[in-house]
Amino acid sequence: SVYYGSIEAGGTKFVLAIADEHFNI
């Protein structure tokens, strides 16, 4: 399964792409 999300921290937006055995920030 793949999850796409976004986190806003310090006024900067980070995009997360997470797969079962893959972690990409």
From Swiss-Prot:
Inhibition by zinc ions (Potential). Inactivated by EDTA. GO terms for molecular function: ATP binding; fructokinase activity; metal ion binding. Its cofactor is Mg(2+). Optimum pH is 7.0-8.0. It is an enzyme of class 2 (transferase). It comes from the Bacteria. Homodimer. Two isoforms, fructokinase I and II, have been found in this organism. This is Fructokinase-1. It comes from Lactococcus lactis subsp. lactis (Streptococcus lactis).
